[in-house]
């Protein structure tokens, strides 16, 4: 028997029609340019002590869940939402209205459009699946490099691995957007950064239920809280240009906006009320920098603290 190759893998994901009920996956659901993805089961075994000596009886599996980590270059063709956004972000609580994705405070399956996913990892003749999955995301934008988004999903590990032929999808051909020729501002002042990270800050929990329709012990995952955070390392500025100590130490929330790419083929992440939570001195190859952390606080209404707009 030849060895199975780790690089020979395909990622697939599909929105579930019924929360927590696994969907069948086909090549159409694998039309992603996914990188560094894997599904890891997380199933504890309860040990059972035997009698008469130092021995144990066969253990009992507890709740059956797992995680999937996956990352994508942030591609966009300038017209329609890419699959990494239209399929995966609603399972993180960010729902699209046209080309704008906004956070929603609601469990999956409701009218607001929050979803759960069935996720498959096809790996050189085998398949692992999570169902009822929801997750959290983080955007990594390093200047001059492709913009990346990383997802971590949690879901039910309700079926064992199976042997199955690997899918052969038609992959997207649109290139990821480079972090260049864009715009980055805080309180209307341009920031010159080497790196920006934007973390959705979701708290994902499994919904235990004795009435669950499979062996897992869970209905699905659910997002129960979020605290979006932005970190960046802009060059330091004179106080006359931007008084960052004052912005930090007076609880002053101001607008943050980052446009990745040129207008007409760009992705903009906006936080209308970003509050500086920390400011430390940094060093970028001898250039004075400020290591900044913002919390995306409430905007003018609920669920407006952090939006993603495709232009």
Residue ranges and their predicted role:
Residues 1-311:
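Signature of extracytoplasmic/envelope-associated structural regions
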């Amino acid at each position: 028997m030849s060895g199975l190759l780790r690089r020979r893998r395909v990622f697939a994901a599909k929105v579930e029609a019924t929360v927590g009920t696994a969907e069948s996956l086909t090549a159409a659901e694998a039309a992603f340019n996914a990188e560094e993805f894997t599904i890891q089961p997380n199933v504890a075994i309860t040990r059972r002590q035997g009698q008469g000596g130092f021995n144990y009886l066969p253990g009992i599996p507890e709740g059956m869940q797992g995680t999937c980590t996956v990352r994508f270059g942030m591609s966009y063709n300038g017209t329609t939402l890419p699959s990494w956004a239209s399929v995966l972000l609603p399972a993180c609580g960010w729902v699209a209205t046209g080309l704008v994705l906004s956070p929603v405070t609601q469990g999956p399956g409701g009218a607001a459009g929050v979803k759960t996913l069935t996720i498959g990892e096809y790996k050189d003749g085998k398949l692992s699946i999570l169902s009822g999955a929801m997750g959290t995301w983080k955007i990594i934008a390093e200047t001059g490099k492709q913009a990346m988004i990383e997802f971590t999903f949690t879901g039910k590990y309700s079926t064992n691995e199976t042997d199955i032929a690997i899918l052969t999808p038609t992959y997207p051909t649109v290139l990821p957007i480079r972090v260049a020729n864009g715009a980055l501002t805080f309180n209307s002042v341009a920031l010159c950064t080497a790196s920006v990270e934007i973390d959705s800050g979701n708290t994902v929990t499994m919904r235990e239920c004795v009435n669950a329709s499979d062996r897992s012990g869970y209905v699905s995952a659910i997002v129960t809280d979020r605290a979006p955070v932005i970190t960046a390392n802009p060059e330091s500025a004179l106080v006359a240009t931007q008084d960052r100590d004052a912005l930090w130490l007076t609880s002053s929330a101001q607008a943050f906006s980052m446009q990745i790419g040129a207008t007409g083929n760009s992705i903009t992440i906006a936080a209308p009320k970003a509050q500086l939570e920390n400011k430390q001195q940094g060093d970028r190859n001898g250039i004075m920098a400020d290591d900044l952390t913002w919390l995306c606080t409430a905007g003018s209404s609920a669920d407006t603290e952090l939006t993603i707009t495709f232009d």
